[in-house]
Amino acid sequence: GDQFATLTACALATRRILLGTSISSVFVRSAPTIAMAAATVDHFSNGRFILGLGPSHKVQVEPEHGLVFSQPIQRVRECVEVVRRLLRDGDVSYKGSIINIERFDFWFTPLRKEIPIYLSAVFPKMLQVCGEIAQGALITWCTQEHARSAAEYVAQGARQAGRNPQEV
């Protein structure tokens, strides 16, 4: 089923648990669609939603969805920027190197103007991006050693962006 629909049902059936997507692919959904879905779950959960985004993998995006998997890191960066602008401002015009939106308007006011965004990452560059622009990193299937090195890459990205690594 659809992760946002399932999370909305969970939101209506619970009161305290935090709800998150783990990873919603920035290739499979457009940035405005992600922002609308996130705002909807956040509304029905009364602010308990955490948005997890990532590029997914070429072996899923291309054969399973019929889309071209290219420039995943840039696509993630632009998607995060568009999602944040929509949540904050309610509308967006955006010209990026990948995402181009003439104008998109929510036509509603989100419950929160800022929803925490976590990014999925496996390799060093994407882990650094997590530190630069996200509230945290989503890593799976890793050893303790990989988790430690991943944390260092996230911290490097945070420092490069002028952020406190302890806040990521």
Predicted region positions:
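Active-site-adjacent structural elements that line small-molecule/cofactor binding pockets in enzymes
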Residues: G1-V168
